[in-house]
Amino acid sequence: MKFETINQESIAKLMEIFYEKVRKDKDLGPIFNNAIGTSDEEWKEHKAKIGNFWAGMLLGEGDYNGQPLKKHLDLPPFPQEFFEIWLKLFEESLNIVYNEEMKNVILQRAQMIASHFQNMLYKYGGH
């Protein structure tokens, strides 16, 4: 059953499905594993942290207090095309978790974030 509303439970499910895809991806997996680690415990912490980020973005709640853009700026350079892969995997995950209306709400936000990060990384960040 797909979620018809965005809530903490649905965001947690999204994080589980999405990051399982990321970890297995031939392009994104190595970048994320190098930055986060390879243990399930390290990934559990990351999923909770990013879940809090999305809860803040989508629900106005959560206790995220990181600097996601800085984290990306600190990564070794990677091809800009990897953002397309990230968005594809994110949309696939949204399709599993949410109905069409909620998927589109979250996807629009994800596309805006990806666009902003790309501008900052590739126009101004030296990637």
Curated annotation (Swiss-Prot):
Tell me which GO cellular component terms the UniProt record holds. cytoplasm
Question: Which cellular compartments is it found in?
Answer: Cytoplasm
Q: What is its main location?
A: cytoplasm
Keywords in alphabetical order? Cytoplasm, Heme, Iron, Metal-binding, Transport
What does a knockout show?
Answer: Cells lacking this gene grow less well than wild-type under conditions of high aeration.
Q: Which InterPro entries match?
A: Globin-like_sf, Globin/Proto, Hemoglobin_trunc
Question: In the record, what terms sit under GO molecular function?
Answer: heme binding; metal ion binding; oxygen binding
Q: What is the effect of changing H46L?
A: Known as E7, reduces accessible space in the distal pocket, retarding ligand binding. Enlarges distal pocket, facilitating ligand entry
Q: Which domain of life is it from?
A: Bacteria
Q: What does the record's cofactor remark say about binding? A: Binds 1 heme group per subunit; upon expression in E.coli it purifies predominantly in the Fe(2+)-oxy form, binding O(2) tightly even under anaerobic conditions.
Induction statement: Constitutively expressed, it is further induced by S-nitrosoglutathione (GSNO) and S-nitroso-N-acetylpenicillamine (SNAP) (at protein level).
Q: Which cofactor does it need?
A: heme
Task: Kindly list the positions annotated as binding heme.
Answer: Y64, H72
Q: How does it assemble?
A: Monomer.
Function noted in UniProt: Has been suggested to be involved in cytochrome c peroxidase or P450-like oxygen chemistry or cyanide detoxification. The high oxygen affinity of this protein suggests that it probably does not function as an oxygen transporter.
Similarity annotation:
Belongs to the truncated hemoglobin family. Group III subfamily.
What's the protein here called?
Group 3 truncated hemoglobin ctb
Taxonomic placement: Bacteria, Pseudomonadati, Campylobacterota, Epsilonproteobacteria, Campylobacterales
